[in-house]
Curated annotation (Swiss-Prot):
Coiled coil: none annotated. This is Probable transcriptional regulatory protein Cagg_2594. It comes from Chloroflexus aggregans (strain MD-66 / DSM 9485). The keyword DNA-binding applies. GO terms for molecular function: DNA binding. GO terms for biological process: regulation of DNA-templated transcription. Belongs to the TACO1 family. It is found in: Cytoplasm.
Length: 252
Protein backbone atom coordinates (compact mmCIF):
# COMPACT_ATOMS: atom_id res chain seq x y z
CA UNK A 1 0.00 0.00 0.00
CA UNK A 2 1.35 3.46 -0.88
CA UNK A 3 2.03 5.98 1.87
CA UNK A 4 -0.92 8.16 0.87
CA UNK A 5 -3.27 5.17 0.80
CA UNK A 6 -1.94 3.89 4.12
CA UNK A 7 -2.39 7.33 5.68
CA UNK A 8 -6.04 7.54 4.62
CA UNK A 9 -6.65 3.97 5.79
CA UNK A 10 -5.33 4.87 9.25
CA UNK A 11 -7.46 8.01 9.33
CA UNK A 12 -10.58 6.01 8.40
CA UNK A 13 -9.81 3.48 11.14
CA UNK A 14 -9.53 6.28 13.69
CA UNK A 15 -12.97 7.53 12.58
CA UNK A 16 -14.57 4.28 13.73
CA UNK A 17 -15.33 5.41 17.28
CA UNK A 18 -18.66 7.12 17.96
CA UNK A 19 -17.32 10.65 18.51
CA UNK A 20 -15.24 10.66 15.33
CA UNK A 21 -18.08 9.00 13.43
CA UNK A 22 -20.38 11.86 14.42
CA UNK A 23 -17.74 14.30 13.18
CA UNK A 24 -17.46 12.33 9.93
CA UNK A 25 -21.23 12.54 9.38
CA UNK A 26 -21.06 16.31 9.92
CA UNK A 27 -18.33 16.64 7.29
CA UNK A 28 -20.21 14.40 4.84
CA UNK A 29 -23.40 16.42 5.37
CA UNK A 30 -21.56 19.64 4.62
CA UNK A 31 -20.15 18.10 1.43
CA UNK A 32 -23.72 17.31 0.37
CA UNK A 33 -25.00 20.77 1.28
CA UNK A 34 -22.27 22.56 -0.68
CA UNK A 35 -22.61 20.21 -3.65
CA UNK A 36 -26.36 20.86 -3.71
CA UNK A 37 -25.94 24.63 -3.63
CA UNK A 38 -23.03 24.80 -6.08
CA UNK A 39 -24.71 22.38 -8.50
CA UNK A 40 -28.03 24.20 -8.28
CA UNK A 41 -30.02 20.99 -7.88
CA UNK A 42 -30.96 18.46 -5.21
CA UNK A 43 -31.26 15.74 -7.85
CA UNK A 44 -28.09 13.61 -8.02
CA UNK A 45 -28.94 12.62 -11.60
CA UNK A 46 -28.61 16.27 -12.59
CA UNK A 47 -25.81 17.21 -10.17
CA UNK A 48 -22.68 15.07 -10.51
CA UNK A 49 -20.87 16.55 -7.52
CA UNK A 50 -23.93 15.83 -5.37
CA UNK A 51 -24.06 12.26 -6.67
CA UNK A 52 -20.46 11.69 -5.57
CA UNK A 53 -21.13 13.24 -2.15
CA UNK A 54 -24.17 11.02 -1.60
CA UNK A 55 -22.29 7.90 -2.71
CA UNK A 56 -19.51 8.69 -0.24
CA UNK A 57 -22.04 9.29 2.55
CA UNK A 58 -23.80 5.99 1.88
CA UNK A 59 -20.48 4.15 1.74
CA UNK A 60 -19.94 5.40 5.31
CA UNK A 61 -23.44 4.26 6.39
CA UNK A 62 -24.82 7.76 6.82
CA UNK A 63 -28.62 7.59 7.43
CA UNK A 64 -30.84 8.66 4.52
CA UNK A 65 -32.62 11.23 6.69
CA UNK A 66 -29.28 12.97 7.32
CA UNK A 67 -28.59 13.00 3.60
CA UNK A 68 -31.99 14.50 2.80
CA UNK A 69 -31.62 17.13 5.52
CA UNK A 70 -28.25 18.17 4.08
CA UNK A 71 -29.78 18.48 0.60
CA UNK A 72 -32.60 20.66 1.94
CA UNK A 73 -30.05 22.89 3.65
CA UNK A 74 -28.25 23.30 0.35
CA UNK A 75 -31.52 24.24 -1.34
CA UNK A 76 -32.17 26.91 1.30
CA UNK A 77 -35.14 25.04 2.76
CA UNK A 78 -33.65 24.79 6.24
CA UNK A 79 -33.64 27.25 9.14
CA UNK A 80 -30.00 26.38 9.82
CA UNK A 81 -27.26 28.89 8.99
CA UNK A 82 -25.85 28.77 5.47
CA UNK A 83 -22.66 26.77 4.89
CA UNK A 84 -19.88 28.33 2.81
CA UNK A 85 -16.78 26.74 1.32
CA UNK A 86 -13.46 28.43 2.18
CA UNK A 87 -9.82 27.60 1.43
CA UNK A 88 -6.96 28.34 3.82
CA UNK A 89 -3.26 28.15 3.04
CA UNK A 90 -0.02 27.91 4.94
CA UNK A 91 3.27 26.15 5.53
CA UNK A 92 4.14 23.29 7.83
CA UNK A 93 7.49 22.19 9.26
CA UNK A 94 10.15 21.63 6.61
CA UNK A 95 8.49 24.10 4.23
CA UNK A 96 5.61 21.72 3.44
CA UNK A 97 2.84 23.58 1.57
CA UNK A 98 -0.63 22.98 3.01
CA UNK A 99 -3.98 23.79 1.38
CA UNK A 100 -7.12 23.39 3.51
CA UNK A 101 -10.69 23.01 2.27
CA UNK A 102 -13.21 24.05 4.92
CA UNK A 103 -17.00 24.24 5.11
CA UNK A 104 -18.38 26.51 7.79
CA UNK A 105 -21.33 28.50 9.06
CA UNK A 106 -18.97 30.80 11.00
CA UNK A 107 -15.96 32.08 9.06
CA UNK A 108 -14.39 33.81 12.09
CA UNK A 109 -14.48 30.65 14.20
CA UNK A 110 -12.94 28.53 11.46
CA UNK A 111 -10.21 31.06 10.65
CA UNK A 112 -9.28 31.27 14.32
CA UNK A 113 -9.17 27.47 14.71
CA UNK A 114 -7.03 26.99 11.60
CA UNK A 115 -4.61 29.76 12.55
CA UNK A 116 -4.23 28.44 16.11
CA UNK A 117 -3.59 24.91 14.85
CA UNK A 118 -0.84 26.12 12.52
CA UNK A 119 0.81 28.16 15.26
CA UNK A 120 0.64 25.40 17.90
CA UNK A 121 2.13 22.76 15.63
CA UNK A 122 5.17 24.40 14.08
CA UNK A 123 3.42 25.81 11.03
CA UNK A 124 2.64 29.27 9.75
CA UNK A 125 -0.68 30.39 8.21
CA UNK A 126 -0.34 32.10 4.84
CA UNK A 127 -2.19 34.62 2.74
CA UNK A 128 -4.55 33.60 -0.07
CA UNK A 129 -2.46 32.52 -3.05
CA UNK A 130 0.66 31.80 -1.02
CA UNK A 131 0.60 28.05 -1.77
CA UNK A 132 -2.48 27.38 -3.90
CA UNK A 133 -0.42 27.88 -7.08
CA UNK A 134 1.45 24.69 -6.17
CA UNK A 135 -1.73 22.62 -6.58
CA UNK A 136 -4.08 21.79 -9.44
CA UNK A 137 -7.69 20.63 -9.46
CA UNK A 138 -8.02 16.97 -10.40
CA UNK A 139 -10.47 14.11 -10.33
CA UNK A 140 -9.41 11.08 -8.29
CA UNK A 141 -10.86 7.60 -8.70
CA UNK A 142 -9.81 4.86 -6.30
CA UNK A 143 -10.09 1.16 -7.08
CA UNK A 144 -9.77 -1.46 -4.34
CA UNK A 145 -7.70 -4.20 -5.98
CA UNK A 146 -8.91 -6.78 -3.45
CA UNK A 147 -12.42 -6.35 -4.91
CA UNK A 148 -11.40 -7.57 -8.36
CA UNK A 149 -9.43 -10.45 -9.86
CA UNK A 150 -8.39 -8.38 -12.86
CA UNK A 151 -4.72 -7.68 -13.41
CA UNK A 152 -3.58 -4.21 -12.24
CA UNK A 153 -1.77 -3.63 -15.54
CA UNK A 154 -5.02 -4.30 -17.41
CA UNK A 155 -6.88 -1.88 -15.14
CA UNK A 156 -4.18 0.73 -15.68
CA UNK A 157 -4.57 0.46 -19.46
CA UNK A 158 -8.37 0.67 -19.15
CA UNK A 159 -8.00 3.83 -17.06
CA UNK A 160 -5.67 5.45 -19.59
CA UNK A 161 -8.00 4.51 -22.45
CA UNK A 162 -10.88 6.03 -20.46
CA UNK A 163 -9.06 9.37 -20.24
CA UNK A 164 -6.88 9.19 -17.12
CA UNK A 165 -3.69 11.25 -17.22
CA UNK A 166 -1.93 9.45 -14.35
CA UNK A 167 -2.35 6.09 -12.63
CA UNK A 168 -0.58 4.96 -9.45
CA UNK A 169 -0.60 1.23 -8.70
CA UNK A 170 0.37 -0.43 -5.43
CA UNK A 171 -0.40 -3.72 -3.69
CA UNK A 172 -3.93 -2.82 -2.59
CA UNK A 173 -5.21 0.19 -4.52
CA UNK A 174 -5.25 1.83 -7.92
CA UNK A 175 -5.31 5.63 -7.84
CA UNK A 176 -6.54 7.13 -11.10
CA UNK A 177 -6.09 10.85 -11.74
CA UNK A 178 -7.85 12.81 -14.47
CA UNK A 179 -9.05 16.31 -15.25
CA UNK A 180 -11.89 17.22 -12.89
CA UNK A 181 -14.12 18.06 -15.84
CA UNK A 182 -13.57 14.53 -17.17
CA UNK A 183 -14.20 12.69 -13.90
CA UNK A 184 -17.77 11.71 -14.72
CA UNK A 185 -16.80 10.39 -18.16
CA UNK A 186 -13.76 8.46 -16.90
CA UNK A 187 -15.72 7.03 -13.98
CA UNK A 188 -18.58 5.90 -16.20
CA UNK A 189 -16.22 4.36 -18.76
CA UNK A 190 -14.58 2.30 -16.01
CA UNK A 191 -17.93 1.25 -14.55
CA UNK A 192 -19.02 0.15 -18.03
CA UNK A 193 -15.94 -2.09 -18.09
CA UNK A 194 -16.92 -3.63 -14.75
CA UNK A 195 -14.19 -1.91 -12.74
CA UNK A 196 -15.15 -1.77 -9.01
CA UNK A 197 -14.74 1.87 -7.97
CA UNK A 198 -14.51 2.45 -4.23
CA UNK A 199 -14.38 6.26 -4.38
CA UNK A 200 -14.46 9.17 -6.83
CA UNK A 201 -13.94 12.79 -5.85
CA UNK A 202 -12.58 16.20 -6.74
CA UNK A 203 -9.21 16.95 -5.15
CA UNK A 204 -6.38 19.48 -5.22
CA UNK A 205 -3.19 17.63 -6.18
CA UNK A 206 0.29 18.97 -5.56
CA UNK A 207 2.19 19.56 -8.80
CA UNK A 208 5.42 18.34 -7.19
CA UNK A 209 6.19 16.64 -3.86
CA UNK A 210 8.96 17.42 -1.39
CA UNK A 211 10.86 15.21 1.06
CA UNK A 212 12.04 17.12 4.15
CA UNK A 213 14.11 15.30 6.76
CA UNK A 214 12.27 12.74 8.89
CA UNK A 215 11.83 15.02 11.91
CA UNK A 216 10.19 17.77 9.85
CA UNK A 217 8.18 15.25 7.81
CA UNK A 218 6.73 13.67 10.96
CA UNK A 219 5.97 17.11 12.40
CA UNK A 220 4.25 18.13 9.15
CA UNK A 221 2.17 14.94 9.19
CA UNK A 222 1.20 15.69 12.80
CA UNK A 223 0.06 19.18 11.77
CA UNK A 224 -1.96 17.72 8.89
CA UNK A 225 -3.67 15.31 11.31
CA UNK A 226 -4.52 18.14 13.72
CA UNK A 227 -5.98 20.21 10.88
CA UNK A 228 -8.03 17.25 9.61
CA UNK A 229 -9.46 16.84 13.11
CA UNK A 230 -10.95 20.35 13.11
CA UNK A 231 -14.75 20.23 12.86
CA UNK A 232 -14.97 22.70 9.97
CA UNK A 233 -12.14 21.22 7.89
CA UNK A 234 -13.25 18.94 5.06
CA UNK A 235 -9.91 18.05 3.44
CA UNK A 236 -6.24 18.88 3.85
CA UNK A 237 -3.87 18.75 0.88
CA UNK A 238 -0.09 19.04 0.99
CA UNK A 239 3.00 18.61 -1.14
CA UNK A 240 4.57 16.27 1.42
CA UNK A 241 5.77 12.99 -0.09
CA UNK A 242 3.97 10.64 2.30
CA UNK A 243 5.92 7.40 2.02
CA UNK A 244 4.87 4.09 3.56
CA UNK A 245 7.92 4.28 5.84
CA UNK A 246 6.92 7.75 7.05
CA UNK A 247 3.37 6.65 7.91
CA UNK A 248 4.66 3.58 9.75
CA UNK A 249 7.03 5.76 11.80
CA UNK A 250 4.19 8.19 12.54
CA UNK A 251 1.83 5.41 13.64
CA UNK A 252 4.40 3.56 15.76
Amino acid sequence: MSGHSKWHTIRRAKSANDQRRGQLFTKLARDITIATREGGSGDPELNFRLRLAIEKARANNMPNENIQRAIERGLGKSNEAAIEEIFYEGYGPGGVAILIEAATDNRNRTSSDVRATFNKNGGSPGEPGSVSWMFEQKGLITVDLSATKRDPDELQLLAIDAGADDVIVDDETLEIYCEWTQLNAVRQALLDQGVPISNAEKIMRAKTLIQPDEKDALAALRLIEKLEDLDDVQKVYSNLDITTELVERFDS
